[in-house]
Amino acid sequence: LYNFEEKESLFVSRKICFVAMGFGKKMDYRNSKEVDLDIIYKKVIKNLFDSLTEYELIRADEISGSEIIDVSMYSLLLKADLVIADITTMNENAIYELGIRHALKPFSTIIMMQESEKIPFDLNHCRILTYKDFGEVLDDEEAEKIKTNLHSFIKASEEQNIDSPLYTYLPNIVPPNISDRELDELLDTAKTKEETISNLVGK
């Protein structure tokens, strides 16, 4: 697990990539098929970022502490250098986090999903990295194809062109900003709440 409490400041040494997606096996009710989202994360996303040493990769289930998760998730959606949202199965949390990211950051957001004829209307004009339905096993050749495409999307995102529909259609909106010091204070507050809850439960 990724422990934010041990970080003096999260965003100082390496670029951060936050992954918004479901984890484990989930049902895709659009086609009544079960999808193992951990396969695409481990074999494609994590595998690719193992070679992108300038980035630190974080997925929500790798964050320890319930209060820390809440604060750090919103902080990451604002401050992360890159967010990858895999919306396969139309996972509610991933869709919600993608919407927050689009509201907070004009650029550096990548959407990916398994191929489907049913793309949400509000996203059908966004650039989306799609990959084939791989069933229960993602073979190495197909994994390499997806990794190559994802790497291209990452390189393009570093140009910081606007990819948020909100900032595309309402260009006068100014994105919010938070300093590293303020972020550390929020994380410290969350840590204190976590310890207080633990003490109360333990009594």
Language-model features: locations:
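Short N-terminal amphipathic alpha-helices
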Residues: Y55-R59, I87, L98
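Conserved N-terminal substructure of TIR/SEFIR domains
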Residues: Y2-I63, S75-A80
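Short acidic active-site motifs
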Residues: I68-S72
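Short, acidic/glycine-rich phosphate-metal binding loop used to engage nucleotide
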Residues: E62-S66, T88-M90
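C-terminal interaction surface of TIR/SEFIR-family domains
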Residues: R127-K203
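Cross-kingdom TIR/SEFIR domain
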Residues: Y74, T89-I154
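Serine-centered coil/turn micro-motif
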Residues: D28-Y29, P120, S164-P165
